[in-house]
């Protein structure tokens, strides 16, 4: 199959079946496509849609982002995970204001210098918003290429990645680049999926090596799954009426800049902290433990509830410590486990 036929098959499929009504495809701009592409780096389209709508409603442009606080951005990102993405958006908005007078740049060399943006994301932003000729190589596109060309190897292998870039550069059409890129992403997301691909309806099936061999599972090679390490954390839930004591996390490992319950590596540390705050440890209530899965470890969370009859001098608010009100919540970023606990209190589970 020639490069032209490959791209034409993808374009024909896109015109008939491609996604054309996603929120970021309507009245699209460099800004809206940028936000969507950052969200989609680690998130499915289905999960990203409500967050995107809410984000654009609150931050319709670069200026509104610059006029906000990081806490406001993290608040709207809460629950989506991978919070560095939100921080990078906020940092980028400040850079764009300073270097480009608040206008999102339309030069590849400028876009790729923004935090959290690599070659593929920069190409996606320019091709999808302005139809500029820039190939993309996200996870969906990589999967299509290794199966179609029968390329054996790990996707993280730099030699494999270089080979895939050479291929996608050669088959991406100069005209209709945006539609081709969207078509490739859509085929990867809906047909050439990781498990049990729908090869019978794929527009590229006739010359796809994986389909001819009937061995789609061979491509790409999978990393040997490692058992994720287990970690334990103790949350101290300080509650006064409808208010909960939260502090901004400063640790580098997880949830930096998000507001959390006081957390400790073991129960002994937690009890020492309570004694320092003159809290009777006999009033502690053990809540139901649960776990939260990260990409690199599993965190077992043991919450301990303390109901305060009054607010003591140890719990005074400042910009890093607040009483979070369940009925009138402040606009701050919350990790998903903290959200989960607060939601359960809202439902009167505890």
Curated annotation (Swiss-Prot):
Domain of life per record: Bacteria
Amino acids binding [4Fe-4S] cluster: 192, 199, 202, 208
Cofactor: binding comment: Binds 1 [4Fe-4S] cluster. The cluster does not appear to play a role in catalysis, but is probably involved in the proper positioning of the enzyme along the DNA strand.
Keyword entries, A-Z: 4Fe-4S, DNA damage, DNA repair, Glycosidase, Hydrolase, Iron, Iron-sulfur, Metal-binding
GO BP annotations, alphabetical order: base-excision repair; mismatch repair
Reaction it catalyzes: Hydrolyzes free adenine bases from 7,8-dihydro-8-oxoguanine:adenine mismatched double-stranded DNA, leaving an apurinic site
Classification via SUPFAM superfamilies: DNA-glycosylase (SSF48150), Nudix (SSF55811)
Site description Transition state stabilizer, residues in chain: 138
EC supergroup of this enzyme: hydrolase
Keyword flag Heme: no
Family the entry assigns: Belongs to the Nth/MutY family.
Function, in words: Adenine glycosylase active on G-A mispairs. MutY also corrects error-prone DNA synthesis past GO lesions which are due to the oxidatively damaged form of guanine: 7,8-dihydro-8-oxoguanine (8-oxo-dGTP).
Assembly mode: Monomer.
Cited PANTHER family: ADENINE DNA GLYCOSYLASE
Record protein name field: Adenine DNA glycosylase
């Amino acid at each position: 199959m020639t490069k032209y036929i490959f791209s034409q098959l993808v374009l024909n499929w896109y015109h008939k079946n491609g996604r054309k009504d996603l929120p970021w495809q309507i009245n699209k701009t460099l800004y809206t496509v940028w936000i969507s592409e950052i969200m989609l780096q680690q998130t499915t389209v289905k999960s990203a849609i409500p967050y995107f709508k809410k984000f654009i409603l609150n931050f319709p442009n670069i200026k509104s982002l610059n006029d906000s606080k990081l806490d406001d951005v993290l608040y709207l990102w809460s629950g989506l995970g991978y919070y560095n993405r939100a921080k990078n958006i906020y940092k980028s908005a400040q850079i764009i204001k300073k270097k480009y007078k608040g206008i999102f740049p339309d030069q590849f060399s400028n876009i790729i210098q923004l935090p959290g943006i690599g070659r593929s994301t920069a190409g996606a932003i320019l091709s999808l918003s302005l139809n500029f000729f820039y190939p993309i190589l996200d996870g969906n596109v990589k999967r299509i290429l290794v199966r179609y060309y029968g390329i054996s190897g790990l996707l993280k292998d730099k030699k494999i990645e270089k080979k895939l870039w050479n291929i996608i550069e050669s088959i991406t059409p100069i005209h209709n680049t945006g539609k081709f890129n969207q078509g490739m992403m859509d085929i990867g997301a809906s047909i050439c999926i990781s498990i049990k691909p729908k090869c019978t309806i794929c527009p590229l099936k006739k010359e796809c090596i994986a389909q001819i061999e009937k061995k789609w599972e061979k491509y790409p090679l999978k990393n040997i799954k490692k058992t994720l390490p287990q970690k334990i954390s103790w949350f101290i839930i300080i509650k006064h009426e409808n208010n909960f004591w939260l502090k901004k996390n400063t640790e580098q490992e997880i949830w930096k800049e998000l507001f959390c319950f006081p957390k400790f590596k073991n129960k002994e540390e937690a009890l020492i902290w309570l004694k320092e705050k003159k809290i009777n440890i006999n009033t502690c209530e053990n809540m139901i433990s649960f776990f939260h899965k990260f990409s690199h470890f599993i965190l077992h969370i043991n919450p301990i509830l303390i109901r305060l009859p009054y607010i003591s001098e140890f719990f005074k608010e400042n910009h890093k410590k607040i009483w979070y009100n369940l009925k009138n919540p402040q606009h701050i970023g919350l990790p998903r486990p903290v959200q989960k606990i607060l939601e359960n209190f809202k439902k009167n589970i505890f």
